[in-house]
Amino acid sequence: MPDYLLTFELSKDRDELFIHGNAAGLRYLARVASRLAEHADGGRREHDHLMTEEWAGHELSSVAQDPAASLLNQVTIRGWPTRGGAHDLP
């Protein structure tokens, strides 16, 4: 389990994503996003997987913060070098 709080949770209606984090968890998420942005700036497609311990990871917390929401055990963040993202692939 990470020494910070960071969860991604889907609302009961599954139409809204909630990100819960303490200061350290949000800083970790910012570092991941910053690293992906650097790759995208360099013209490279890159991604990162964030997972709970239950899914053999250590990046996400395992305890949902909203009892009505569904905890996501894996989040994949993709960085794209163009605005079109996957739609710009040959």
Question: What do the predicted segments below correspond to?
Answer:
Residues M1-P90:
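Positively charged, low-complexity terminal tracts
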